[in-house]
């Protein structure tokens, strides 16, 4: 079953953010756009390249009013150790959620049960807590934060402009579509 257009479930997890341990719940996402950026494990190979890419785009995400939560089934203590030992991960200013029980990962139907690891997946959640976009890739395929930004801008545009949709490769400032009977067969 697809989770698109479904509300995120309640959760409560510990996270590492800006040198501190914090608690994060679904209430922290209310009224804000959120990205849940799941990855298999700390101290691995593709994961730090992705998390570093998101860190490099974090300022732009913040300007869009987006909170970022990276999530793995590691503990928040492991996240702190990784943050302290990796130059790439040390750039991260967003919350790194620990999910050692896998409850949050399962809430997003994103657990590899046989391994106890999260799949490599991104969920864009609107201010009402509704999932608007999902991207899942195989373990060896890294995600691109530039495309994540494009998808967030498209989701925000569509939310602010009912009746309009963003076509493939849409970028901010480009033409959108207004689906109607007149458009059928003309695109």
Curated annotation (Swiss-Prot):
Pfam hit, one: 1-cysPrx_C
Secretion signal, residue range per the UniProt entry: none
Gene3D superfamilies tied to this protein: Glutaredoxin
Catalytic residues, chain numbering: 47
Domain of life: Bacteria
Domain Thioredoxin: residue ranges: 2-157
Catalytic activity: a hydroperoxide + NADH + H(+) = an alcohol + NAD(+) + H2O
UniProt KW keywords: Antioxidant, Cytoplasm, Disulfide bond, Oxidoreductase, Peroxidase, Redox-active center
An annotated GO cellular component: cytosol
GO terms of molecular function: NADH-dependent peroxiredoxin activity; thioredoxin peroxidase activity
InterPro entries registered for this protein in UniProt: AhpC, AhpC/TSA, Peroxiredoxin, Peroxiredoxin_AhpC-typ, Peroxiredoxin_C, Thioredoxin-like_sf, Thioredoxin_domain
GO biological process, one term: hydrogen peroxide catabolic process
EC number of the protein: 1.11.1.26
Cellular location(s): Cytoplasm
Subunit-level organization: Homodimer; disulfide-linked, upon oxidation. 5 homodimers assemble to form a ring-like decamer.
Family: Belongs to the peroxiredoxin family. AhpC/Prx1 subfamily.
Remarks, miscellaneous: The active site is a conserved redox-active cysteine residue, the peroxidatic cysteine (C(P)), which makes the nucleophilic attack on the peroxide substrate. The peroxide oxidizes the C(P)-SH to cysteine sulfenic acid (C(P)-SOH), which then reacts with another cysteine residue, the resolving cysteine (C(R)), to form a disulfide bridge. The disulfide is subsequently reduced by an appropriate electron donor to complete the catalytic cycle. In this typical 2-Cys peroxiredoxin, C(R) is provided by the other dimeric subunit to form an intersubunit disulfide.
Role noted for this protein: Thiol-specific peroxidase that catalyzes the reduction of hydrogen peroxide and organic hydroperoxides to water and alcohols, respectively. Plays a role in cell protection against oxidative stress by detoxifying peroxides.
Protein name per the record: Alkyl hydroperoxide reductase C
């Amino acid at each position: 079953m697809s989770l698109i257009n479904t509300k995120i479930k309640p959760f409560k997890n510990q996270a590492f953010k800006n040198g501190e341990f914090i608690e994060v719940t679904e209430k922290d996402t209310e009224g804000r756009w959120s990205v849940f950026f799941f990855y298999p494990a700390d101290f691995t190979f593709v994961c730090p390249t992705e998390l570093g890419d998101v860190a490099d785009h974090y300022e732009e995400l913040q300007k869009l009013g987006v909170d970022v939560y990276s999530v793995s089934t590691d503990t928040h203590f492991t996240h702190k150790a990784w943050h302290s030992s990796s130059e790439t991960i040390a750039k991260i200013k967003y919350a790194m959620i620990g999910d050692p029980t896998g409850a949050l990962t399962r809430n997003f139907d994103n657990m590899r049960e046989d391994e106890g690891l999260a799949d490599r997946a991104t969920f864009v959640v609107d201010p009402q807590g509704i999932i608007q976009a999902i991207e899942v890739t195989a373990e060896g395929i890294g995600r691109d934060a530039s495309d994540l930004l494009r998808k967030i801008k498209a989701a925000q545009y569509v939310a602010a402009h009912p009746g309009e949709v963003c076509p493939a490769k849409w970028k901010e400032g480009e033409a959108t579509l207004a689906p109607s009977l007149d458009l059928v067969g003309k695109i």
